[in-house]
């Protein structure tokens, strides 16, 4: 008897993810350039973002995470949604896959000029900020000032959590 890998099944968004995609589409169509997905840990925010990028047709995406292991894990999740339909690459930790359609990197890596300046300001249609409650930190601010994507998408389970590097900002 032949065993079929679960990976071969076409992934479909769950009800929370479908609602998120619908709401994000409305936000984008209204002309907004920033959106925030707030959902508890383990509810599928990463997959929700991948399904949204696919459904909304974003061609060039930068996904920023807080730790290198998350960059690799997130890339694998996106590969499950997209298959081979877009190229995906890592930047940082010895990886220099700058030309991929979808880039996964830590904010600390992109904060360094040798990586940041590989990209024009409008290089990405969407930039996704995982753990968006860290956005007030200087490392995020430098990256955010460099880019002008059509959409900034923040994701967090804890929107009220404060970053240690906030320097008194609210």
Task: Give the positions of each predicted feature.
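Post-DEXD/H (motif II) to motif III coupling segment of the RecA-like Helicase ATP-binding lobe
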Residues: 125, 133-170
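Catalytic P-loop NTPase motifs of RecA-like helicase/translocase cores
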Residues: 71, 110-113, 129-136, 161-162
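Conserved H-loop
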Residues: 42, 66, 157
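Structural beta-sheet core signal
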Residues: 63-64, 154
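Conserved helix/coil segment N-terminal to the catalytic DExD/H
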Residues: 93-126, 137-142
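ATP-dependent helicase/translocase motor core
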Residues: 1-43, 47-60, 76, 80, ...
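Conserved helix-turn-beta segment of the N-terminal RecA-like "Helicase ATP-binding" lobe
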Residues: 58-61, 68-94
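Residues that mark the start of a beta-strand
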Residues: 34, 59-60, 85-87, 125-126, ...
């Amino acid at each position: 008897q032949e065993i079929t890998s679960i990976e071969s099944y076409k992934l479909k968004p769950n009800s929370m993810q479908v609602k998120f995609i619908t709401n994000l589409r409305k936000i984008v169509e209204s002309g907004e350039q920033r959106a925030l997905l707030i959902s508890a840990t383990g509810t599928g925010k990463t997959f929700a973002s991948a399904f949204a990028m696919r459904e909304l047709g974003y061609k060039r995406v930068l996904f920023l995470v807080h730790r290198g292991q998350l960059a690799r894990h997130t890339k694998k999740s996106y590969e499950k949604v997209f298959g081979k339909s877009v190229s995906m690459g890592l930047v940082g930790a010895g990886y220099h896959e700058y030309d991929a359609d979808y880039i996964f990197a830590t904010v600390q890596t992109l904060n360094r000029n040798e990586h940041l300046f590989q990209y024009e300001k409008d290089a990405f249609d969407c930039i996704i900020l995982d753990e968006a409650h860290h956005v007030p930190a200087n490392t995020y601010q430098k990256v955010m000032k460099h880019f002008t994507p059509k959409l900034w998408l923040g994701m967090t389970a804890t929107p009220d959590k404060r970053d240690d590097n906030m320097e008194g900002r609210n």
